[in-house]
Amino acid sequence: MELTHFNEEGRARMVEVTEKQETVRTAVAAGEITMRPETLELILDKKVAKGDVLAVAQVAGIMAAKKTGDLIPMCHPLNLTGVDISFTIKVPDTIEAKAKVTCVGKTGVEMEALTAVSVTLLTIYDMVKAVEKGMVIKNIRLLEKTGGKSGDYRREE
């Protein structure tokens, strides 16, 4: 398999996509943050001093997806057509975040989905770190992607 982010001299480059066909691209990524049960209870009861943790984290994840091209050096800036962040509470101590990102474009949105999930979880950490510093962000992964020349991908869990 060829690594496409290097030129003939072995130096970094942004992949040329001018001739690629525009298709609908989607990606879904997920990750988790674990914490003490008491910390999760504070979040769910909306008793964290900084505000509604999940609402703020959701907006942060959406913003992060839109800024991925500014954060990851070889990512193309994309005109996203949709970003959705959702949460699954896994009692007693875990929040799973999922990001679904969509665009019509010449390159995939996997990095946007992964960035969205990462920043969503980092925002949860930031908002409750005064209560607990031992939280663990883990298992950030691409679950699926559709569109493009390489075809569809679905992680076997």
From Swiss-Prot:
The keyword Lyase applies. It comes from the Bacteria. One of its GO terms (molecular function) is cyclic pyranopterin monophosphate synthase activity. Pathway: Cofactor biosynthesis; molybdopterin biosynthesis. Its EC number is 4.6.1.17. Keywords: Lyase, Molybdenum cofactor biosynthesis. One of its GO terms (biological process) is Mo-molybdopterin cofactor biosynthetic process. Substrate binds at residues 74-76, 111-112. CDD domains: MoaC_PE. InterPro entries: MoaC, MoaC_bact/euk, MoaC_sf, MoCo_biosynth_MoaA/MoaC, Mopterin_CF_biosynth-C_dom. It catalyses: (8S)-3',8-cyclo-7,8-dihydroguanosine 5'-triphosphate = cyclic pyranopterin phosphate + diphosphate. The keyword Ubl conjugation does not apply. Coiled coil: none annotated. The active site is at 126. It holds the Pfam family MoaC. Belongs to the MoaC family. Homohexamer; trimer of dimers. Catalyzes the conversion of (8S)-3',8-cyclo-7,8-dihydroguanosine 5'-triphosphate to cyclic pyranopterin monophosphate (cPMP). This is Cyclic pyranopterin monophosphate synthase. It comes from Carboxydothermus hydrogenoformans (strain ATCC BAA-161 / DSM 6008 / Z-2901). The lineage of its organism: Bacteria, Bacillati, Bacillota, Clostridia, Thermoanaerobacterales.
